[in-house]
Amino acid sequence: MAFTNPYLQRVYDDLAKRNPEQKEFLQAVEEVLESLEPVVAAHPEYEKAGLIERLVEPERIIMFRVPWVDDAGKVQVNRGYRVQFNSAIGPYKGGLRFHPSVNLSILKFLGFEQCFKNSLTSLPMGGGKGGADFDPHGKSDAEVMRFCQSFMTELYRHIGPDTDVPAGDIGVGGREVGYLFGQYKRLKNEYTGVLTGKGIPFGGSLARTEATGYGLCYFTKEMLADAGKSFEGQRVVISGSGNVAIYANQKATQLGGKVIAMSDSNGYIVDENGIDYKVMKEIKEVKRARIKTYLDYVPTAKYVEGSQGIWTVPCDIALPCATQNELPLAGAEALVANGCYAVAEGANMPSTPEAIAYLQSHGILFAPAKASNAGGVATSGLEMSQNSLRLSWTFEEVDERLHNIMVNIYHSAAATAEKYGMKGNLVAGANIAGFEKIASAMMSQGIV
């Protein structure tokens, strides 16, 4: 990667030398540093304070073994992690991911992105991420409980409501958060808001489940409005069929769009009449079945093997909501060729750098994940506030606050991009807007 700023080049080269195998992390850092060139050029004091070197290095990485006993009585050992990236503007905040693919590179990339995303919400939250290479799929409830209890038995000493507040992520839903919270409470003998994404009876927030998908659509609505467009009557393609995708479907439909395609890791479905989010919710959350099952409910829909083909479905708006790097250059080319004019990211870093460059060079409205999918962590922040105040807000109150936060994030990113001569470039605008708050806090707090 070639930067025009020699300071940024040196920082990136040193980082790549120290972490040559961490490609996801280096990709995330590269994208952010590229956006920061004009800001760093305007602030020579950042180099003197070693600000960027400190920004790209986590404050702390905790790695530990997680031994547990399966239903056959056999001892299993997984590896657990918590990356506490930056606490300049608040306690570490970010999800826990339980998936066989979990490694340090992925968690460092997610923790790094989380710093900027949390900053954009304007809530006092630092950035972190954690998880384990444990796969909850195919495990009994008892096995998942024993794993969560073992995981928390080590993690509990490193977290707390004013230190580090984890949440769910891939493989960590309401069930897992409940088991983790129960074990923390048992070990500490105190009832605090140490996790978000909790069940409603024990301190969870209404609208948290819907938040990322809803927030994505609120952000996209603002972006479309600025271009004189709206969801009304538009064909929408959503990759994925998890939490984010299901509620993005619901909100996009409420805003007048028609969601015609959704996917899972096996393939995708196309329903020209619009995919019913309630059916999808039943399939994925109740039956925990593959997306192909949609045909049992709607025989007129079409199923296609292989999830990559979803980008060839003609649409006006595309919302990638599955996983990182799922939208490659070929997918971006197919979207543009078929008339898509807006892409908003619902997953974390779902578009490759080549895909983003292609979309931007073709004048496509593009919303980067750290801005457009910040609804989840924004509502986690609202859950923390409710826990601290010992009260609960209604669904409507939380939804209204979420809507306002997403509108503000859009306008902050758009205004910052314009300020630095990059009008319409929300990637740069979001990176810089998120960075400015963290940089200011870090400069004020000295070399720590």
Where do the language-model regions lie?
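Predominant activation on well-ordered alpha-helical scaffold segments within soluble catalytic domains
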Residues: 12-13, 30, 104, 108-112, ...
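Adenosine-phosphate binding glycine-rich loop
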Residues: 2-28, 223-224, 336-448
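Rossmann-like adenosine-cofactor binding region
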Residues: 267-366, 371
